[in-house]
Amino acid sequence: MMDNDNSLNKRPTFKRALRNISMTSIFITMMLIWLLLSVTSVLTLKQYAQKNLALTAATMTYSLEAAVVFADGPAATETLAALGQQGQFSTAEVRDKQQNILASWHYTRKDPGDTFSNFISHWLFPAPIIQPIRHNGETIGEVRLTARDSSISHFIWFSLAVLTGCILLASGIAITLTRHLHNGLVEALKNITDVVHDVRSNRNFSRRVSEERIAEFHRFALDFNSLLDEMEEWQLRLQAKNAQLLRTALHDPLTGLANRAAFRSGINTLMNNSDARKTSALLFLDGDNFKYINDTWGHATGDRVLIEIAKRLAEFGGLRHKAYRLGGDEFAMVLYDVQSESEVQQICSALTQIFNLPFDLHNGHQTTMTLSIGYAMTIEHASAEKLQELADHNMYQAKHQRAEKLVR
């Protein structure tokens, strides 16, 4: 049992397993979404940056047209520098029709730049943007631009940071909602397992699983409750059968009084109770003319007499004293709350008077039947055997004395 408990403690709970599954699913889903959105965003940004740089180059051609026509290098350089200071490109070249460099401008970095920025710049713009310069419909030169990576890298970092933040926020909301939605599942399963555990551990078949909102759990609850109904009914029948067997084992089937087995158990319990022994006594009672009744009117009449004897003993004892049938016409009674031997003698006299009343044989006849009574005080004996020996001895003495009186 201890090993089973330790094994259960090592196993994850349904709530924890469900939470782990949800966390794993959310993490994988959000990572895939993050990767998909990141790649899509960067590809879109690449197209946007290339078109923006091409648009810048196309705009510059109108400013450089006159300088190229007149081969005015300083004017072209001044134009490139003015536009380059705005941070839209890092290098610019103006070439004439013969591919001679007429003017150029380079952005001077204050730092060498990080690897990521260089990689982004090379990936977005693997080659300079080339835009022809036209005059009167004829190509007279070209301008070549290379984008500046700092602004692009910053924008990419910012976009990824915002995207990551949104993904984390969405993950947090998803986790919160998932836990809230899972509470119903966890509580439903916990309710079922609590009932099953209580039934198994405490044999409490009166427990029932409450109705559940989820169809499968509800169907299981109905089936399990039906099973519990059958088990409870079976347990009640078993308890009733056991009670009947116990009563049969401890009671006389004819008179309904407690039998010899119950007497032995009761007298041993009494002798082991030091307080009860001080105020108790044992009576043995035996019929004096029961054989005559059996021989004269038959055993059925004898049984009716025994039933009447048991009835009178039970009514006399009430809730205070306990009567037993030991077998045949032998009876016993344990007296409780008696303070002296004289009180016991008074009880014996009262019993004798009760049995002086005639018995109705239900066949048109009546008869009398006396009982010989012997008693023993429990306080005077250390064992149940000695107590019974004295009570039995005194009973037979009383029987002999009654027989002698009848002879005289």
Swiss-Prot record:
<feature type="binding site">
    <location>
        <position position="329"/>
    </location>
    <ligand>
        <name>Mg(2+)</name>
    </ligand>
</feature>
<dbReference type="GO" id="GO:0007165">
    <property type="term" value="P:signal transduction"/>
</dbReference>
<dbReference type="GO" id="GO:0005525">
    <property type="term" value="F:GTP binding"/>
</dbReference>
<keyword id="KW-1133">Transmembrane helix</keyword>
<dbReference type="Pfam" id="PF17152">
    <property type="entry name" value="CHASE8"/>
</dbReference>
<feature type="domain" description="HAMP">
    <location>
        <begin position="183"/>
        <end position="236"/>
    </location>
</feature>
<dbReference type="InterPro" id="IPR052163">
    <property type="entry name" value="DGC-Regulatory_Protein"/>
</dbReference>
<dbReference type="GO" id="GO:0032153">
    <property type="term" value="C:cell division site"/>
</dbReference>
<dbReference type="InterPro" id="IPR003660">
    <property type="entry name" value="HAMP_dom"/>
</dbReference>
<keyword id="KW-1003">Cell membrane</keyword>
<keyword id="KW-0460">Magnesium</keyword>
<feature type="active site" description="Proton acceptor">
    <location>
        <position position="329"/>
    </location>
</feature>
<comment type="function">
    <text>Bifunctional protein that catalyzes the synthesis of cyclic-di-GMP (c-di-GMP) in response to reductive stress and then dynamically relocates to the division site to arrest cell division in response to envelope stress. In the presence of high intracellular c-di-GMP levels, and in response to envelope stress, interacts with cell division proteins and halts cell division, without disassembling the Z ring, but by blocking its further progress toward cytokinesis. Part of a network that regulates cell motility by altering levels of c-di-GMP.</text>
</comment>
<feature type="topological domain" description="Cytoplasmic">
    <location>
        <begin position="176"/>
        <end position="408"/>
    </location>
</feature>
<dbReference type="InterPro" id="IPR033417">
    <property type="entry name" value="CHASE8"/>
</dbReference>
<feature type="topological domain" description="Cytoplasmic">
    <location>
        <begin position="1"/>
        <end position="24"/>
    </location>
</feature>
<dbReference type="InterPro" id="IPR029787">
    <property type="entry name" value="Nucleotide_cyclase"/>
</dbReference>
<feature type="topological domain" description="Periplasmic">
    <location>
        <begin position="46"/>
        <end position="52"/>
    </location>
</feature>
<keyword id="KW-0997">Cell inner membrane</keyword>
<keyword id="KW-0812">Transmembrane</keyword>
<feature type="topological domain" description="Periplasmic">
    <location>
        <begin position="134"/>
        <end position="154"/>
    </location>
</feature>
<keyword id="KW-0346">Stress response</keyword>
<dbReference type="GO" id="GO:0052621">
    <property type="term" value="F:diguanylate cyclase activity"/>
</dbReference>
<dbReference type="GO" id="GO:1902201">
    <property type="term" value="P:negative regulation of bacterial-type flagellum-dependent cell motility"/>
</dbReference>
<feature type="binding site">
    <location>
        <position position="286"/>
    </location>
    <ligand>
        <name>Mg(2+)</name>
    </ligand>
</feature>
<feature type="binding site">
    <location>
        <position position="303"/>
    </location>
    <ligand>
        <name>substrate</name>
    </ligand>
</feature>
<keyword id="KW-0479">Metal-binding</keyword>
<dbReference type="GO" id="GO:0005886">
    <property type="term" value="C:plasma membrane"/>
</dbReference>
<feature type="transmembrane region" description="Helical">
    <location>
        <begin position="113"/>
        <end position="133"/>
    </location>
</feature>
<dbReference type="InterPro" id="IPR043128">
    <property type="entry name" value="Rev_trsase/Diguanyl_cyclase"/>
</dbReference>
<keyword id="KW-0472">Membrane</keyword>
<feature type="transmembrane region" description="Helical">
    <location>
        <begin position="25"/>
        <end position="45"/>
    </location>
</feature>
<dbReference type="GO" id="GO:0036460">
    <property type="term" value="P:cellular response to cell envelope stress"/>
</dbReference>
<feature type="domain" description="GGDEF">
    <location>
        <begin position="278"/>
        <end position="408"/>
    </location>
</feature>
<dbReference type="GO" id="GO:0046872">
    <property type="term" value="F:metal ion binding"/>
</dbReference>
<dbReference type="Pfam" id="PF00990">
    <property type="entry name" value="GGDEF"/>
</dbReference>
<protein>
    <recommendedName>
        <fullName>Diguanylate cyclase DgcN</fullName>
        <ecNumber>2.7.7.65</ecNumber>
    </recommendedName>
</protein>
<keyword id="KW-0547">Nucleotide-binding</keyword>
<feature type="topological domain" description="Cytoplasmic">
    <location>
        <begin position="74"/>
        <end position="112"/>
    </location>
</feature>
<feature type="binding site">
    <location>
        <position position="294"/>
    </location>
    <ligand>
        <name>substrate</name>
    </ligand>
</feature>
<feature type="transmembrane region" description="Helical">
    <location>
        <begin position="155"/>
        <end position="175"/>
    </location>
</feature>
<dbReference type="InterPro" id="IPR000160">
    <property type="entry name" value="GGDEF_dom"/>
</dbReference>
